[in-house]
């Protein structure tokens, strides 16, 4: 897929294949093309080049059919603040053609999944940010979709609320729902995704399980060297001379693949490599 906005190439030759029943994470910084990709998968934005098939439906020709089997949780809160949780879910049950006889049960199920039963008759204006986010998820699940698209599902939420959303997403995976999630939170991708595709400048530059990405691009261990700026500059120069992959990590220089270093390695603290190390090694960018 390719998509341009004027001179800006938002998505540049992206190939994506999401198998059923997995949580697939698109990980990248803001501007990597994640949200544009999500909009193309719902036919809100049309690709300039390439073909898109979602759940066996060709887009954009069969986008209406695909949307009936797809749940979408947008990045931005677009809830009607004057309606109650129950009213919003009832409206969307009708829009998604849930049979009349099954609507009440569908609404109750969605409220239960999102842990919003006690707030069923509360208007949206009175809900906390975390509750509103859970309501967005419940709205996307009202019709029992085969595929759920989550665009930055926990952006702007505090850590406790983020954990609650992660538990909800874990429940979707346990139910066999296919989840495609975009995120710029490394911890979120590492925690939730079965497979992670790292995006940069509109392309997928690496793909695999979190553990596979770490092994392939950061190794098993990282050596962190602390000290004054002058010492860190010397360590960076030493790493460059010996071809050791390294990066600045807060007040330290982190050297990848520490398990392979020879006796010339400086003194420092060793730790297991993680997905952040792999991401920075791949892209050269630091993200959350």
Placement of each model-derived feature along the sequence:
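Conserved ABC ATPase signature
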Residues: 123-130
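Conserved catalytic motifs of ABC-family nucleotide-binding domains
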Residues: 144
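ABC transporter nucleotide-binding domain
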Residues: 165-256
